[in-house]
Protein backbone atom coordinates (compact mmCIF):
# COMPACT_ATOMS: atom_id res chain seq x y z
CA UNK A 1 0.00 0.00 0.00
CA UNK A 2 2.67 2.52 1.04
CA UNK A 3 4.93 1.72 -1.91
CA UNK A 4 2.06 2.11 -4.37
CA UNK A 5 1.14 5.52 -2.93
CA UNK A 6 4.75 6.68 -3.08
CA UNK A 7 5.12 5.43 -6.67
CA UNK A 8 1.98 7.42 -7.57
CA UNK A 9 3.68 10.54 -6.20
CA UNK A 10 1.11 10.98 -3.44
CA UNK A 11 1.76 13.07 -0.36
CA UNK A 12 1.92 10.46 2.39
CA UNK A 13 2.18 10.81 6.15
CA UNK A 14 2.44 7.66 8.26
CA UNK A 15 0.10 8.09 11.22
CA UNK A 16 0.46 5.57 14.03
CA UNK A 17 -1.24 5.48 17.40
CA UNK A 18 0.48 3.86 20.36
CA UNK A 19 0.05 3.26 24.06
CA UNK A 20 1.37 6.35 25.84
CA UNK A 21 2.35 4.29 28.89
CA UNK A 22 4.22 1.62 26.92
CA UNK A 23 5.52 3.42 23.80
CA UNK A 24 4.30 0.43 21.80
CA UNK A 25 1.75 0.01 19.04
CA UNK A 26 -0.77 -1.83 21.13
CA UNK A 27 -2.05 -4.83 19.18
CA UNK A 28 1.09 -5.41 17.09
CA UNK A 29 3.36 -4.93 20.14
CA UNK A 30 5.86 -2.88 18.13
CA UNK A 31 8.04 -0.23 19.78
CA UNK A 32 7.54 3.25 18.33
CA UNK A 33 11.30 3.45 17.76
CA UNK A 34 10.83 0.74 15.13
CA UNK A 35 7.94 2.68 13.59
CA UNK A 36 10.26 5.71 13.37
CA UNK A 37 12.93 3.55 11.66
CA UNK A 38 10.34 2.36 9.13
CA UNK A 39 9.24 5.91 8.34
CA UNK A 40 12.86 6.99 7.99
CA UNK A 41 13.69 4.04 5.73
CA UNK A 42 10.74 4.76 3.43
CA UNK A 43 11.38 8.51 3.67
CA UNK A 44 7.86 9.44 4.80
CA UNK A 45 6.89 11.89 7.54
CA UNK A 46 5.64 10.28 10.74
CA UNK A 47 2.88 11.46 13.05
CA UNK A 48 2.81 9.52 16.32
CA UNK A 49 -0.39 9.70 18.36
CA UNK A 50 -0.07 8.71 22.04
CA UNK A 51 -3.20 7.14 23.48
CA UNK A 52 -3.72 7.17 27.23
CA UNK A 53 -6.18 4.83 28.96
CA UNK A 54 -9.79 5.89 28.36
CA UNK A 55 -8.74 8.19 25.50
CA UNK A 56 -11.32 9.20 22.90
CA UNK A 57 -9.62 7.50 19.94
CA UNK A 58 -11.42 9.38 17.19
CA UNK A 59 -10.82 12.75 18.85
CA UNK A 60 -7.07 12.05 19.24
CA UNK A 61 -6.74 10.96 15.61
CA UNK A 62 -8.64 14.03 14.41
CA UNK A 63 -6.29 16.21 16.48
CA UNK A 64 -3.41 14.48 14.68
CA UNK A 65 -4.99 15.27 11.31
CA UNK A 66 -5.04 18.95 12.32
CA UNK A 67 -1.35 18.78 13.28
CA UNK A 68 -0.53 17.17 9.92
CA UNK A 69 -2.46 19.86 8.07
CA UNK A 70 -0.78 22.64 10.07
CA UNK A 71 2.72 21.21 9.51
CA UNK A 72 2.34 20.33 5.82
CA UNK A 73 -0.11 22.95 4.60
CA UNK A 74 -2.05 20.13 2.95
CA UNK A 75 -5.58 19.03 3.77
CA UNK A 76 -6.10 15.42 4.90
CA UNK A 77 -8.61 14.04 2.41
CA UNK A 78 -7.89 10.34 2.17
CA UNK A 79 -7.15 7.66 4.75
CA UNK A 80 -5.48 4.48 3.52
CA UNK A 81 -5.54 1.21 5.46
CA UNK A 82 -3.91 -2.14 4.75
CA UNK A 83 -6.94 -4.26 5.65
CA UNK A 84 -7.13 -7.50 3.66
CA UNK A 85 -10.57 -9.04 4.18
CA UNK A 86 -12.15 -8.22 7.55
CA UNK A 87 -15.36 -6.53 6.44
CA UNK A 88 -16.45 -5.48 9.95
CA UNK A 89 -13.22 -3.52 10.52
CA UNK A 90 -13.42 -1.98 7.06
CA UNK A 91 -17.02 -0.89 7.65
CA UNK A 92 -16.09 0.58 11.05
CA UNK A 93 -13.36 2.64 9.40
CA UNK A 94 -15.73 3.88 6.68
CA UNK A 95 -18.40 4.80 9.24
CA UNK A 96 -15.96 6.37 11.72
CA UNK A 97 -14.18 8.44 9.08
CA UNK A 98 -17.21 9.23 6.89
CA UNK A 99 -15.95 12.76 6.17
CA UNK A 100 -12.84 11.32 4.47
CA UNK A 101 -12.26 9.05 1.53
CA UNK A 102 -11.37 5.69 3.09
CA UNK A 103 -9.24 3.51 0.83
CA UNK A 104 -8.39 -0.16 1.38
CA UNK A 105 -6.50 -1.05 -1.82
CA UNK A 106 -5.48 -4.51 -0.61
CA UNK A 107 -9.01 -5.54 0.34
CA UNK A 108 -10.02 -8.89 -1.20
CA UNK A 109 -6.82 -9.14 -3.26
CA UNK A 110 -6.03 -12.88 -3.48
CA UNK A 111 -3.29 -13.99 -1.09
CA UNK A 112 -1.26 -15.50 -3.92
CA UNK A 113 -0.97 -12.04 -5.49
CA UNK A 114 -0.33 -10.30 -2.15
CA UNK A 115 2.41 -12.74 -1.20
CA UNK A 116 4.05 -12.45 -4.62
CA UNK A 117 4.11 -8.65 -4.26
CA UNK A 118 5.36 -8.94 -0.67
CA UNK A 119 8.26 -11.27 -1.52
CA UNK A 120 9.25 -8.99 -4.42
CA UNK A 121 9.21 -5.96 -2.10
CA UNK A 122 11.29 -7.82 0.49
CA UNK A 123 13.90 -8.57 -2.17
CA UNK A 124 13.82 -5.20 -3.93
CA UNK A 125 14.04 -3.15 -0.71
CA UNK A 126 16.23 -5.61 1.25
CA UNK A 127 13.66 -6.03 4.02
CA UNK A 128 13.22 -8.54 6.82
CA UNK A 129 9.84 -9.56 8.20
CA UNK A 130 9.50 -11.21 11.59
CA UNK A 131 6.76 -11.99 14.06
CA UNK A 132 6.20 -9.17 16.55
CA UNK A 133 3.88 -11.35 18.63
CA UNK A 134 4.06 -15.01 19.56
CA UNK A 135 1.76 -17.44 17.79
CA UNK A 136 0.65 -20.20 20.16
CA UNK A 137 -1.27 -23.14 18.75
CA UNK A 138 -2.17 -26.50 20.27
CA UNK A 139 0.31 -28.29 17.99
CA UNK A 140 2.84 -25.54 17.20
CA UNK A 141 4.36 -22.36 18.54
CA UNK A 142 6.21 -19.56 16.78
CA UNK A 143 8.05 -17.12 19.08
CA UNK A 144 8.52 -13.38 18.64
CA UNK A 145 11.28 -12.81 16.10
CA UNK A 146 10.45 -15.84 13.94
CA UNK A 147 11.09 -14.99 10.28
CA UNK A 148 7.90 -14.44 8.32
CA UNK A 149 8.86 -16.01 5.02
CA UNK A 150 7.47 -18.41 2.42
CA UNK A 151 8.31 -21.39 4.63
CA UNK A 152 6.37 -19.99 7.61
CA UNK A 153 3.46 -18.98 5.37
CA UNK A 154 3.29 -22.57 4.09
CA UNK A 155 3.38 -23.95 7.66
CA UNK A 156 0.61 -21.59 8.72
CA UNK A 157 -1.54 -22.74 5.81
CA UNK A 158 -0.94 -26.39 6.72
CA UNK A 159 -2.04 -25.59 10.29
CA UNK A 160 -5.24 -23.95 9.07
CA UNK A 161 -4.08 -20.47 10.09
CA UNK A 162 -4.71 -17.41 7.94
CA UNK A 163 -1.43 -17.09 6.05
CA UNK A 164 -1.42 -13.29 6.37
CA UNK A 165 -2.43 -13.47 10.06
CA UNK A 166 -5.41 -11.26 9.25
CA UNK A 167 -7.60 -12.79 11.95
CA UNK A 168 -5.28 -11.66 14.72
CA UNK A 169 -3.39 -14.94 15.12
CA UNK A 170 -0.17 -12.96 15.16
CA UNK A 171 1.44 -9.78 13.89
CA UNK A 172 4.57 -8.92 11.97
CA UNK A 173 7.29 -6.29 11.89
CA UNK A 174 8.87 -5.19 8.61
CA UNK A 175 12.32 -3.63 8.90
CA UNK A 176 15.30 -2.97 6.66
CA UNK A 177 17.79 -5.81 6.91
CA UNK A 178 20.93 -5.12 8.88
CA UNK A 179 23.95 -4.68 6.65
CA UNK A 180 25.54 -7.88 7.97
CA UNK A 181 22.55 -10.13 7.23
PLM feature segments, named:
Residues 1-181:
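Nucleotide-activated chemistry modules centered on ATP-dependent adenylation/adenylyltransferase
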Amino acid sequence: TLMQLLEEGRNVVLLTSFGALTNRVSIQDIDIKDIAKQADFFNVPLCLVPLYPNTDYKKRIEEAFKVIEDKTGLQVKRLVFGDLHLQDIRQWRIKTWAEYEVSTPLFDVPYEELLSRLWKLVTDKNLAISLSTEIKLPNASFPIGTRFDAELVHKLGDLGIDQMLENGEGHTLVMPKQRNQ
